[in-house]
Structures are given as C-alpha cells and as structure tokens.
C-alpha cells in the first residue's frame, strides 16, 4: 500500500505547502481587517408626523412621504394636543429611507443585500391616569405599509411593496415624570426584514388605529417620538466577501477533481474518510458558489434563507466530518470490517442531525414566512420570543459541548498514540524514524483541527447571539469584525484544501524491502537518509487492510519484526 501524501511527502515540500497555506490564511484576515468595512451599518430615522385625508385610512395605495415634491405637511405635537379628538385615526408616522447627507439625496445599493427595521416607541400618560406601574407586554396594533421607488422615478412614484396589520408587545420603563404627564420608553421591537435590497428608496407608513368596541390601542396614552433603526449590510463588505468566494471557488473545485481522480486510480473502493472528504468538499463548494452576484440583477428575497440553508449544510457536514476524522484515527479498530457511518458513528451523529434539523425548522418558521410577509417576526409574541431565545441559547451551549467532546476524542487519539509509541524502540531504526515523523505530522494536523473547530464554534455562537434580540436595547451594531469573518471563512477553505491534498492517495511505488535487507542496513545510511531534505518517507512492509488510507490507522496491528 502506497499510503497518503501526508506520509510520503518530503519534509521540504511539506514545509513549503504549510507555509503557503499559512500565508493565505494571514492574507484572508488582512483582507477583512484592512480593506473591508464593518459587516453591517445602520441609520436612525426619526418619524415625521403627518395627517391623512379623512376616509382614506383603508386605501392601501395612499402613501404619505416627507421629502420631495408633493410631500405631506408635518403636524406638530401642539397641533395634535389642541385637536378635540387628538386626530384619532388620522395620524401617520412617516419614515423615508435612506436619509439625505450634505443636502444630497442618497440611495440604497444592491450590494447592501438586505434591510432590517426595528422600532423604538415612546408614549406618555396624563398625570390623571390610573397607571401606577410601567406597562409590561402591552399589545400594540400597527397598520404597516412599506413602499419603494427607484432612481428616475418621480417623487410621488411610490409603489406599495407590502401591507400588513400586525401586533407587537411592548415592555416599557419610565423615562420622565413631569407635572402633567409621564413618559415611557419601550424596548425596541422588530418591524420588518427584507431579504433583498433591490430598490433605491424605501418608504414606511405606520398607523395606530383606535377602535373602542375591540379596545384596539386604547390602553395607550398618546404617542411621542417613534425612532426607526434601519440595519443593512455594508456594500464594501459584500464586495470583499464575493471577491473571496470568487477566488476560492475554482481552487476548491479543482482540488476535489484531483483528489477523486487519484482515489479512483487505486485498486480498491474508496474508504470512509475519503468519502467524507469529498462530501465535505462538495458542501464547501456549494457554500463558495457566489450566487449573490445574481441579486445584483434580479430581485431575490429568498437569498437570506438560501444563504442560511447553505451555511447549515456546511456546518452539518463539517461537524460530521470532524467526528469521523477523529474516530477513524482512534487506533482502536480491532475488527477488519470496513467502517461505515451507520455502524460506528450513528450515536455521535444523531445529535448533530437533530440539532441541524431543528435549526432548519426554526429558520423556515421565520424567514420562510417573511418571503410573503416581511412584517412577520417570531419575536413578536412573548411566548414565541422566549422559546426562540431558549432555542438559540441551547444551540450555543450545544456547540460548546460538541467542541469539548471533539477535544476529548482527539485527546484519546493522542493518548492511544502515546501508548503505542512504547513499541517504537523495538522496531528497526528505519521503521521507527518513519513512524516518529508520521506521528509528528499527524499531531500537527490534529492541533490545526482543534484551532479550526474552536474558531468555527466561536463564530457560530456569535452568529446565534446576533440572532437574539438582547443586544438591540444597548447597541444595534454589535457584530463580529470583518477580519474575523473573512479569516474564519478563509480558514475553512484552507483547512479543507489541505486535507484534500494531504489525505489524497500517494501513487509512489517503493521497492519491497525484505526483512534480511532491512536488518543489515547500516546505521550510517539510515542517518544519512533521514537527514536528507529531499528524502521521501518510504512505506515499510505491512499487513494492513487494503481499505485503509493511512498507515497510522493500522499502527496498533503492526508487529515489530526486528
């Protein structure tokens, strides 16, 4: 058996390969740290108060806007207070995005990919109100209308994008106590999420209808300031991200073809680890495919959901591979039968499968529904929000437990290798040098696996933390840095690229060394061969199972022949 490239590659060539890959890894971090802006940006828009014509409340095509020709005339708070009915069912809160800068109108770019809106509400009660405690889980009914227009359209050329009447629940605290009224400031609430930022300008109209028979919105005093925070992906970050994908995609495809061709040249069926490597490469290729370019031409509101699905498939495959990778090197395979996922790893992988399916269902329940109703949010209902938060926390805890279990498996691998190294002194010097070098290389690869797993789990937990709503009340811009995101993404590609190279079958054929020839080889020749930088590690005679791809996995069944 010729073994793998990891076993047979010369020290000089291996050093060049590792150095090149490490330089590429540093380049990925620098690309995000020096050239890419923050992954996301946000703008805060204070709502303008307008009064609509009587009887047009149910006309969804009637839209009010605050800038441009034909804009509505703003209504002041004093005018509302002086009105006998407080302008009930006539007030519209208008938000026009993006805001102008330096007297110049700005527009959204398709490079910004998506748009999320969250709202902060402030309202007041008269001092004569019977309210004694801050409102908790106070139901607010909102009539929401989202519209858009593009460059070149007239100022009044707004087109309705979505309309819905939704319920939100507010938790508020007292922010100001005055002689005539008490002001309350409420937690931010999710308002809408657009999976595609295809148009240049967006307009949001909010109405808070009052209805006595159904007690709709009657528990509120009167609205004060409404602040909309619009969060978008930064276009500069998207360009760097797509550049990274565009460069990495052909390299991974090419190395997969090369790897699978070498496997099929062998006179045996592919081993389990070889199958897992090609599946992992396929999942990475699907993730690398720069489909985001299509969103620059076509409106694809499902792009966020598709990105989550691609990321989920890759996570599932990567977590599965690490368990199999560590398990195949446990060096305790006493049975000669070929390993299969079902026979050896179903207990370990069942938890991974259940977790990934649960996350997929959770994602479908929110982003799948948002394809038809961008105002829908699983965080809108108190019970659903608590369940979602519990689910996210459990996902983060499960990721940490998985990492600890993987560390335990790799520790067992190291311990088993250490136990079997006691047999090295009884071997011939050539055989001992071969295995010592192989063990050193394998330990380095396992340590690289631990680092990759640690950064992956950290990124996953940070992503789940960003999904939660607990940060909105402090800082809506909390996010991983661009350097971390591009670095981890590059690390996945470099790590899998290296595995496909190092675990590809080596086709070098070495002359058979008989026992008598090996035992009579002089010590001087052995030392001279080991010291040479160009020497290839020869595969010594063994009785290994032909289905194995690494001589290290059969180390425990080797018997010293000295």
From Swiss-Prot:
A single Gene Ontology CC term: presynaptic membrane
Pfam families: WLS-like_TM, WLS_GOLD
Lumenal side: 35-239, 292-311, 366-390, 463-482
Membrane topology: Multi-pass membrane protein
Chief site of localization: membrane
A GO molecular-function descriptor: Wnt-protein binding
Residues the record marks as carrying a glycan: 58
Domain of life from the UniProt record: Eukaryota
Example of a GO biological process term: positive regulation of protein secretion
Keywords attached to this entry: Cell membrane, Cell projection, Developmental protein, Endoplasmic reticulum, Endosome, Glycoprotein, Golgi apparatus, Membrane, Postsynaptic cell membrane, Segmentation polarity protein, Synapse, Transmembrane, Transmembrane helix, Wnt signaling pathway
Spans within the Cytoplasmic topological domain: 1-13, 261-270, 333-344, 412-441, 504-562
Record carries keyword Nucleotide-binding: no
Places the protein is found: Presynaptic cell membrane; Postsynaptic cell membrane; Cell membrane; Endoplasmic reticulum membrane
Composition-biased stretches (Polar residues): 541-556
Positions of region (Disordered): 539-562
Membrane spanning stretches: 14-34, 240-260, 271-291, 312-332, 345-365, 391-411, 442-462, 483-503
Subunit text: Interacts with wg; in the Golgi. Interacts with Vps35, a component of the retromer complex; wls stability is regulated by Vps35.
Family listed: Belongs to the wntless family.
Function of the molecule: A segment polarity gene required for wingless (wg)-dependent patterning processes, acting in both wg-sending cells and wg-target cells. In non-neuronal cells wls directs wg secretion. The wls traffic loop encompasses the Golgi, the cell surface, an endocytic compartment and a retrograde route leading back to the Golgi, and involves clathrin-mediated endocytosis and the retromer complex (a conserved protein complex consisting of Vps35 and Vps26). In neuronal cells (the larval motorneuron NMJ), the wg signal moves across the synapse via the release of wls-containing exosome-like vesicles.
Full protein name: Protein wntless
Organism of provenance: Drosophila erecta (Fruit fly)
Taxonomy of the source species: Eukaryota, Metazoa, Ecdysozoa, Arthropoda, Hexapoda
